[in-house]
Amino acid sequence: MRVLCAFPEAMASSSSRPPSCLALVALFLALLLHLSLSFHAGNRRPLPVDRATGLKEKTLILLDVSTKNPVRTVNENFLSLQLDPSIIHDGWLDFLSSKRLVTLARGLSPAFLRFGGKRTDFLQFQNLRNPAKSRGGPGPDYYLKNYEDDIVRSDVALDKQKGCKIAQHPDVMLELQREKASQMHLVLLKEQYSNTYSNLILTARSLDKLYNFADCSGLHLIFALNALRRNPNNSWNSSSALSLLKYSASKKYNISWELGNEPNNYRSIHGRAVNGSQLGKDYIQLKSLLQPIRVYSRASLYGPNIGRPRKNVIALLDGFMKVAGSTVDAVTWQHCYIDGRVVKVMDFLKTRLLDTLSDQIRKIQKVVNTYTPGKKIWLEGVVTTSAGGTNNLSDSYAAGFLWLNTLGMLANQGIDVVIRHSFFDHGYNHLVDQNFNPLPDYWLSLLYKRLIGPKVLAVHVAGLQRKPRPGRVIRDKLRIYAHCTNHHNHNYVRGSITLFIINLHRSRKKIKLAGTLRDKLVHQYLLQPYGQEGLKSKSVQLNGQPLVMVDDGTLPELKPRPLRAGRTLVIPPVTMGFYVVKNVNALACRYR
């Protein structure tokens, strides 16, 4: 713009300027001031780093939730846990009485605790009481002279306790155990890579320790029996299982049961295949063993715990459902996302990977509903990476994107229970490490347990979708799920709603609550990595505060950050969080 009235450098006094010129200048300055104020009023946000980022941040996502009726209702124990029988091999079973481990497990109750895995079908029960004489593997001399004696002394001390048997293991004892487990970890990995497994002995003492851990932690034990003990005609040999059933019944242990683990792999690991109809007959045989035992006459039975539903696996499931579909209380299968030997940190952010589970769910549901419509389906033994996991990846913050999306997707598609492999174990897929410290997925699971109820709600968004280019599929990098808030959480009244959101974008996203959620108070629980490692961090922060245990018997308080009513939710890039929308008075959430 040119100003037609200009002044010389040696300006005269204002009184000497022509009146028409002064008016024109005044009008021009007023116009500039008005434009400046308008600009600043409408742009109170950080300046974009580049043009692309600026365009993304202008997209405001409107979010509403259907509050009249839930679309699904899952099990109260929806998020459950698994322990692998390898803890017998590496010695960690003897430390399940640890006060710290029990505290961590109790934080995730109520839940099922499945005792099963790849070594299920190599497990034999022996009714022995002396753990020192029955433990496999000689080990170094100091293990035999000191370590084993310490275990025996610890067991004697525990036997004197009434009720829950809790131990405080000395640091030296734990350090020796970590050395032993580290050596055994190499043996276990070799077995897994070669697909050849050695036999395991479960003693009565070990079963007592396992049940004590589950009972003290508020977990319901599901025990997977060995299905590979076969008679010459390929029928199941139940002698070892019957011995275990009689012992646990004599102790009045409240246990549910399974038979076998990934039966589709039996030919490769045992040289003898078991088809679906034979496995169905084996389950009927197990049911007939349980019914005469008063303690287990009404015990739940789950199976067949198949692997990824490829063509041959679907055929096995089909044969099983024809014969024993009505025998089991829920149909179970397993899922692994990535090969742990080749995984990279960016793999955990790939939406294509997050979506692989959805197709498997539909395949399983199709077979189950053909024979037993409405039968509950469980995903057991879900892991992010195979081969025991990958250090600094499957035990890091990055793995949480897969885990949280798995929880949201399974509930949305009607899967009743998901069992996480593993709560505590060798390798790097666990929730708790071998120093008994909770890893990022533990804190994520704890938040889920505290805030998420079993009722699933439908989410409606606007401003999120865009038209794909020809030949391309748009996969959401912003994932939003909604449930009724956990009614056991006394910080929130019935009728509140909890959102959990995954932002895989490299830019922040803004979400405006609309409809029934509009102008409601919100509590934010934003979970981010803590420390210099970023996505590879094994520590997390909640709303900027690092999460650590207070002591061996106390979990930290999970403090929310209150957001004022009507405030836009801002989701930072590559993060996840929970948002409790208070006092919605949602009809779907007011009653159990």
From Swiss-Prot:
Summarizing the function annotation, the protein's role is:
Binds heparin and heparan sulfate with high affinity, but lacks heparanase activity. Inhibits HPSE, possibly by competing for its substrates (in vitro).
What the entry lists under SUPFAM superfamilies is as follows:
(Trans)glycosidases (SSF51445)
What processes does the entry annotate via GO biological process terms? cell population proliferation; extracellular matrix organization; positive regulation of cell population proliferation
Tell me where it resides. Secreted, Extracellular space, Extracellular matrix
Whether Transit peptide counts among this entry's keywords is no
Superkingdom: Eukaryota
Which gene is this protein's source?
Hpse2
Q: Which organism is it from?
A: Mus musculus (Mouse)
Lineage here is: Eukaryota, Metazoa, Chordata, Craniata, Vertebrata
Key words of the record: Extracellular matrix, Glycoprotein, Secreted, Signal
Q: How does it assemble?
A: Interacts with HPSE. Interacts with SDC1 (via glycan chains).
Instruction: Report what the protein is called.
Output: Inactive heparanase-2
Which Pfam families does this chain map to? Glyco_hydro_79n (PF03662)
Q: Which residues are glycosylated?
A: N254, N392
Name the predominant localization: secreted
Please name the GO terms that the record assigns under molecular function: heparan sulfate proteoglycan binding; hydrolase activity, acting on glycosyl bonds
User: Is the Secreted keyword given for this protein?
Assistant: yes
